[in-house]
Amino acid sequence: MTIIIDGKKIASGLCEKLSQRIDVLKREHSIFPCLKVIFVGNNPASQVYVRNKQKKAESIGISSETIVLPDNILENELIEKINELNNDRFVNGILVQLPLPNHINASKVINTVSVEKDVDAFHRENVGKLVKGEKNCLVPCTPKGALHLIKLVETNLSGKNAVVIGRSNIVGKPMFHLLLQENCTVTILHSQSKDLAEYCSKADVVVTAVGKPNFVQEGWIKEGAIVIDVGINSVSIEGKTKLIGDVDFDRVKEKTKAITPVPGGVGPMTIAFLMINTVIAACLQKKVDASDFVS
């Protein structure tokens, strides 16, 4: 019987537990987690993401503010704003909502965020810590959430064959390193890879994040595999817009041990782990043990 992984329910449980921990941190350590989100421009999809992040933060006791800046802001002005937040001791987490306008160097902006406040964990130093396998550090939210779902199904991943489809800095590459740290044998595939079906057919775990609707087919997946679909694709079906993943869900699910739907799979976990990262950042800044937050 295939497990349809309910990411929304799992994320809700994580946030409920986190809310209780935040109450303890406030009461016993005078830690009041604070997240600042910088949103440049007026991208409609980004507006939805930002609104959901702020709503979730406030619902569990994290102080949150979205700083909206015009899309014609100069790069140096944006960097000045980030440095202002870097120097604010009451701010624990800083998130720069991507994408940024074309005239702004996103890499430069991301690496301006203080390492200890980088709750997206995109700063080069946090990336280096992940690659080195350092514990008790900030890890990108989406792959961290995806790994949490995998380990709810299969607690011991040692020796498992895993395939990651997609090599982005946001999902694919960090997912590769997280699975490697679990002692998986990991293969990362991308747009130039050949024989994708052959690699996937040997995998115990498949994580896909390529942004291509119904890309992963039933014939690619072996019986009993765990399939984590990070893709979010907007398609028109019978005149209606619908969100679907990278996986041909209805066909693939029949072969899997467990699979995530889209929507309602990895997406809610991303927001949950952003909240967790914000609290971890606050604890690390205040020298309070945060090891039990790291899944």
From Swiss-Prot:
Entry keywords, A to Z: Amino-acid biosynthesis, Histidine biosynthesis, Hydrolase, Methionine biosynthesis, Multifunctional enzyme, NADP, One-carbon metabolism, Oxidoreductase, Purine biosynthesis
Transmembrane segments: none
PROSITE patterns: THF_DHG_CYH_1, THF_DHG_CYH_2
EC number(s) from the headed UniProt entry: 1.5.1.5, 3.5.4.9
GO biological process, one term: tetrahydrofolate interconversion
Catalysis performed (reactions): (6R)-5,10-methylene-5,6,7,8-tetrahydrofolate + NADP(+) = (6R)-5,10-methenyltetrahydrofolate + NADPH; (6R)-5,10-methenyltetrahydrofolate + H2O = (6R)-10-formyltetrahydrofolate + H(+)
One term under GO cellular component: cytosol
Pathway of action: One-carbon metabolism; tetrahydrofolate interconversion
A GO term for molecular function: methenyltetrahydrofolate cyclohydrolase activity
InterPro entries per UniProt: Aminoacid_DH-like_N_sf (IPR046346), NAD(P)-bd_dom_sf (IPR036291), THF_DH/CycHdrlase (IPR000672), THF_DH/CycHdrlase_cat_dom (IPR020630), THF_DH/CycHdrlase_CS (IPR020867), THF_DH/CycHdrlase_NAD-bd_dom (IPR020631)
Chain residues that bind NADP(+): 166-168, 191, 232
Function of the protein: Catalyzes the oxidation of 5,10-methylenetetrahydrofolate to 5,10-methenyltetrahydrofolate and then the hydrolysis of 5,10-methenyltetrahydrofolate to 10-formyltetrahydrofolate.
Subunit structure: Homodimer.
UniProt family annotation: Belongs to the tetrahydrofolate dehydrogenase/cyclohydrolase family.
Protein name as catalogued: Bifunctional protein FolD
